[in-house]
């Protein structure tokens, strides 16, 4: 165990985590020259297209140190976006150390602070690294001062490197060897292994990534999942280099994958403990806290005959993405679907894109909403994640909305525009700290304002230099209402939204105007209303198509024409009473996508 080092690579988005991973693999011979390519650990098409890491990837490599010791390094490349912070915390739970990568041109950013504090809270050894020192705009001295002032880390032994050119990577490997502690555990104790990640393979069943804390794992060992008490035989064991390599044993302190022929997607939950059977361990390992979704949205298939495939796809995806929550939901307009919980808008977009690409589904998503806390007159609490249900609740004492604690780091010259944006989003300033040319803003902003497009607008007003980190803070009394959309006096539940009183009129006008432009005309008037309770806020009418019943009358008495017009009037009146309004799926798609 003295020759094992387990560590994660953490950083803000685009600071060079994946490129440093490439250099470590290249120098240690994890892949041949023919197999090497840039961002080798970003295996998903979405990761390559967006240039971000979405899923943590584990790699085992061997490094021969300058003192001729062979060191086994198990490292995990983690995502940098705030929406995937749960992936980071899960990865850190399997490690004794963390490499904190900081871009020498951009300096400390909000997610750098958050990731570093997460690692320090878990008592990990954090090694700060300045990357991209080869660029002409790099300013190592300024960034060192930011690290000391903003994060509070010593920079006496900071590593200067360039992942692109390979400068400083050997020095980094030596620092990992000497500074990150080796894992603690007893190979003679009963087996305890933590499930870090799981995914479903069509041929092999559930594949689990595990960290062996005590004991060891061998092929054909009988194991027990401690939460379900179910017993399985280990069929295959291996590691990633990053390509899968089969092994006969996973020793104490090692990270690797196991296949046990589990066909049930809930058979090996992430965060669970694996032990042997018999001679089981008495205690479960402290896993990681189950994260709560920050936003909810309804997901529906455009083709109703795909529902069973959709249900299976969500199950397999949730195994690989433990932060995804879902439960069945029915909409009068969109049919059967699922109410899904996400960590943010990017997380929602990635899940939707993966469902469409990996499972060939056509998905429509309703407007995302946060979770509101409803206090009833009898002081009972009700948590609401579906907007249209608000109008059905009676005896409400007050409605509370979630507030996010936001840390915004930006250059001082963009302060004015950023303060204005935070004010427009109903933000309250808690603190402001100055660090040379950088400012750290501490704001409390309603979560509903943050999760939608706040980050995009923040980047816009700061020319891309501002960075954001946010977390749930508390629930606060809010003056919000449920805005319902009625078409010919029938409520369209999938278009209901919860809106703050100051924004109700604008929101109502926007939705009604879009619907008027998108819904096709019928042979009778269509009335579109935006209402709060029974009060109509905005109303418009899509005028009926006029069928010319007089086209065949070329003369004769005027009473003949009057008779035809009267008959048409009676028919239209009857049609309005019993006629169904056809709202194409494309209309919902355009309205909801715009929202």
Curated annotation (Swiss-Prot):
InterPro entries: EF-4 (IPR006297), EFG_III/V (IPR035647), EFG_V-like (IPR000640), EFTu-like_2 (IPR004161), G_TR_CS (IPR031157), LepA_C_sf (IPR038363), LepA_CTD (IPR013842), LepA_IV (IPR035654). GO terms for biological process: positive regulation of translation. It is an enzyme of class 3 (hydrolase). Residues 2-184 form the tr-type G domain. One of its GO terms (molecular function) is translation elongation factor activity. It is a peripheral membrane protein. It is found in: Cell membrane. Its main location: membrane. It comes from the Bacteria. GTP binds at residues 14-19, 131-134. Keywords: Cell membrane, GTP-binding, Hydrolase, Membrane, Nucleotide-binding, Protein biosynthesis. Required for accurate and efficient protein synthesis under certain stress conditions. May act as a fidelity factor of the translation reaction, by catalyzing a one-codon backward translocation of tRNAs on improperly translocated ribosomes. Back-translocation proceeds from a post-translocation (POST) complex to a pre-translocation (PRE) complex, thus giving elongation factor G a second chance to translocate the tRNAs correctly. Binds to ribosomes in a GTP-dependent manner. This is Elongation factor 4. It holds the Pfam family GTP_EFTU. It catalyses: GTP + H2O = GDP + phosphate + H(+). Belongs to the TRAFAC class translation factor GTPase superfamily. Classic translation factor GTPase family. LepA subfamily. Its EC number is 3.6.5.n1. HAMAP family: LepA. One of its GO terms (cellular component) is plasma membrane.
């Amino acid at each position: 165990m003295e020759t094992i080092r387990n560590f994660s690579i953490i950083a803000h988005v685009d600071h060079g985590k994946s490129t440093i991973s490439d250099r470590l693999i290249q120098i240690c011979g994890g892949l041949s020259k023919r197999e090497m390519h840039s961002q080798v650990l970003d295996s998903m098409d979405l990761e390559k297209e967006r240039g971000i890491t979405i899923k943590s990837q584990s790699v085992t490599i061997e490094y021969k140190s300058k003192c001729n010791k062979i060191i086994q390094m198990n490292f995990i490349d983690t995502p940098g976006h705030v929406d995937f912070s749960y992936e980071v915390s899960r990865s850190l739970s399997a490690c004794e150390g963390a490499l904190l990568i900081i871009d020498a041109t951009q300096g400390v950013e909000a997610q750098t602070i958050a990731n570093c504090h997460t690692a320090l809270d878990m008592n990990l050894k954090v090694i700060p690294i300045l990357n991209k020192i080869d660029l002409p705009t790099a300013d190592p001295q300024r960034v060192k001062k930011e690290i000391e002032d903003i994060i509070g880390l010593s920079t006496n032994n900071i590593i200067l490197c360039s992942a692109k050119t390979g400068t400083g990577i050997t020095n980094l490997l030596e620092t990992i060897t000497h500074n990150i502690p080796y894992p603690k555990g007893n190979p003679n104790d009963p087996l305890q292994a933590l499930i870090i990640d799981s995914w479903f393979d069509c041929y092999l069943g559930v594949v689990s990534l595990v960290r062996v804390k005590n004991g060891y794992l061998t092929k054909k060992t009988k194991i027990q999942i401690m939460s379900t008490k179910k017993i399985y035989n280990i069929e295959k064991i291996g590691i990633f280099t990053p390509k899968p390599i089969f092994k006969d044993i996973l020793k104490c302190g090692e990270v690797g994958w196991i296949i046990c022929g589990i066909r049930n997607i809930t058979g090996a939950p992430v965060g669970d403990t694996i032990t042997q059977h018999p001679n089981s361990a008495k205690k479960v390992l402290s896993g990681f806290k189950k994260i709560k979704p920050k936003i909810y949205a309804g997901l529906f298939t455009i083709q109703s005959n795909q529902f069973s495939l959709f249900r299976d796809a969500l199950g397999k995806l949730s195994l690989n993405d433990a932060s995804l929550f879902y439960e069945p939901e029915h909409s009068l307009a969109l049919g059967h679907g699922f109410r899904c919980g996400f960590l943010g808008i990017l997380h929602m977009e990635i899940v939707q894109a993966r469902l469409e690409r990996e499972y060939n589904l056509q998905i429509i998503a309703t407007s995302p909403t946060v979770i509101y806390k409803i206090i009833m007159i009898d002081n009972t609490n009700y948590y609401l994640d579906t907007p249209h249900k608000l109008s059905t609740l009676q005896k409400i004492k007050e409605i509370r909305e979630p507030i996010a604690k936001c840390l915004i780091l930006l250059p001082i010259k963009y302060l004015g525009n950023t303060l204005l944006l935070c004010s427009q989003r109903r933000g309250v300033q808690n603190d402001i700290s100055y660090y040379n040319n950088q400012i750290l803003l501490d704001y409390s902003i309603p979560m509903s304002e943050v999760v939608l497009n706040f980050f995009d607008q923040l980047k816009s007003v700061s020319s891309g230099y501002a960075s954001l980190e946010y977390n749930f803070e508390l629930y606060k009394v809010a003056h919000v209402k449920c805005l319902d959309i009625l078409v010919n006096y029938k409520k369209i539940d999938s278009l209901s939204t919860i809106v703050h009183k100051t924004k109700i009129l604008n929101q109502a006008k926007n939705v009604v105007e879009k619907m008027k432009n998108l819904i096709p005309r019928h042979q009778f008037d269509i009335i579109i209303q935006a209402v709060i309770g029974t009060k109509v806020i905005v109303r418009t009418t899509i005028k009926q198509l006029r069928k010319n019943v007089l086209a065949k009358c070329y003369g004769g008495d005027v009473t003949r024409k009057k008779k035809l017009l009267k008959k048409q009037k009676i028919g239209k009146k009857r049609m309005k009473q019993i006629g169904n309004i056809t709202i194409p799926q494309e209309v919902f798609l355009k309205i909801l996508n715009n929202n």
